């Protein structure tokens, strides 16, 4: 057997082991997701607001527009104002296949103009002591959202290939853990901070192992990600203490007070939990990119010392800091555009703005998340310098 054949067999065995590892990892991740999805969270307690038990939201199709008295809005000619009378066939719910007549009022705040053949989401009010009442809630956006997600997935797979598929699996796992573990767990009164930290650690582990098999590069990226997210959370905790911020200062905090009284939801930690979740993706991006770059440098020059590798990581990381810092800060600023315009219309003074809960939360969260990325560069460089041993050639 020639040396070339021997090397080919070794590569095949290595690829087979990696494939088996990914299959087992995906199966374990799927079982974890199904366990979270199937758990009876309501057994821990449930809050239900008053006067909503009779409300149901179902899909309906416009069979006929009986009357349309709408006119273009003077402020935005693309929108219409007025009233429509619609005959709608209910496609779901207790009254499925029933046709109902609905008066659809179009205002500047509720503006859903429907045409024959379109589907919409209908609010179906079925009180015990009165007749059913129907209103148009909104457009049925689910099909378009599915197409958008499908286009995103297709682009990731087309460009990323097999690694793109694994990327989507990791993204789906993280989304499922947030939707079916972190949110219901916090809602039902479980300790929000330990729950979030543990869940995000699992998400980091699964996402990185789906991209790369166990190796020093993977462990370096994982440790760096967890350290960067922890630092972002620690920095925000310091900021929130200095600024006297908690979940009660959030715009939705007041509405969650009643929920907290019945389910044990921990309002105090909600802002910190939000920072941990929002910073995870950016910190993981920097950690894995830098760990991969330093791994390639070590492969190219196996004699590099740990100090040289650390210095190289800092040089590479400075460019990442510039781009990722802009990404995070601009993301938070983009969310604030409409609010800031509204505050300008109200004639707010700068001192009033800086003293507001809104500005304090936005600045503290944006800076804390960005610092998690910035501090992730020396952390990743140091961990890689410690884990990447000189190569023996």
Predicted feature locations:
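Pore-lining and gate-forming transmembrane alpha-helices of multi-pass membrane transport proteins
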Residues: 224-225, 229, 260-277, 323, ...
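Helical hairpin unit composed of two closely spaced alpha helices linked by a short loop
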Residues: 280-288, 294-340, 347
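Structural detector for short beta-strands of small beta-barrel domains
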Residues: 53-82
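Loop-to-transmembrane-helix entry motif
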Residues: 14, 188, 192, 313-328, ...
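Hydrophobic secretory-pathway targeting helix
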Residues: 1-50
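Transmembrane alpha-helical segments that form the functional core of multipass membrane systems
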Residues: 150-157, 162-258, 265-278
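Extended, hydrophilic extramembrane loops/domains of integral membrane proteins
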Residues: 106-143
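Hydrophobic alpha-helical transmembrane segments of membrane transport and translocation systems
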Residues: 319, 331-393
């Amino acid at each position: 057997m020639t040396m070339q054949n021997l090397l080919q067999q070794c590569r095949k065995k290595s690829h087979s082991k990696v494939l088996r590892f990914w299959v087992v990892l995906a199966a374990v991740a799927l079982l974890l997701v199904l366990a979270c999805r199937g758990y009876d969270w309501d057994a821990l307690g449930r809050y239900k607001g008053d006067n909503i038990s009779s409300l149901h939201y179902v899909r309906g199709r416009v069979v006929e527009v009986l009357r349309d008295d709408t006119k273009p809005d003077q402020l935005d000619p693309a929108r219409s104002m007025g009233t429509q009378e619609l005959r709608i066939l209910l496609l779901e719910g207790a009254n499925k296949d029933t046709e109902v007549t609905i008066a659809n009022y179009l205002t500047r705040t509720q503006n859903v103009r429907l045409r024959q053949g379109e589907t919409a989401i209908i609010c179906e009010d079925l009180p015990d002591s009165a007749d059913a009442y129907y209103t148009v809630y909104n457009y049925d956006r689910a099909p378009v959202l599915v197409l958008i997600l499908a286009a995103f997935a297709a682009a990731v797979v087309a460009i990323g290939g097999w690694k793109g598929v694994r990327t989507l699996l990791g993204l789906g796992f993280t989304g499922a853990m947030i939707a079916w573990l972190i949110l219901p767990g916090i809602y039902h009164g479980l300790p929000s901070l330990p729950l979030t930290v543990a869940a995000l650690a699992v998400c980091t582990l699964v996402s990185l192992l789906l991209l790369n098999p166990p190796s020093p590069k993977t462990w370096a990226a994982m440790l760096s990600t967890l350290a960067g997210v922890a630092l972002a959370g620690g920095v925000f905790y310091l900021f929130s203490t200095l600024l006297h911020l908690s979940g009660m200062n959030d715009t939705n905090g007041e509405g969650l007070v009643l929920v907290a009284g019945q389910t044990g939801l921990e309002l105090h930690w909600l802002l910190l939990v939000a920072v941990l979740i929002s910073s995870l993706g950016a910190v993981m991006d920097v950690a894995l990119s830098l760990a991969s770059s330093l791994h390639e440098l070590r492969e190219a020059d196996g004699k590099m010392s740990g100090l040289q590798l650390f210095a190289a990581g800092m040089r590479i990381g400075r460019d990442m800091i510039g781009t990722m810092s802009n990404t995070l800060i601009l993301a938070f600023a983009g969310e604030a555009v409409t609010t800031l315009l509204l505050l300008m219309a109200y004639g707010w003074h700068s001192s009033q703005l800086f003293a507001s809960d809104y500005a304090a939360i936005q600045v503290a969260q944006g800076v804390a998340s960005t610092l998690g990325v910035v501090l992730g560069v020396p952390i990743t460089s140091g961990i890689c310098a410690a884990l990447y041993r000189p190569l023996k050639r």
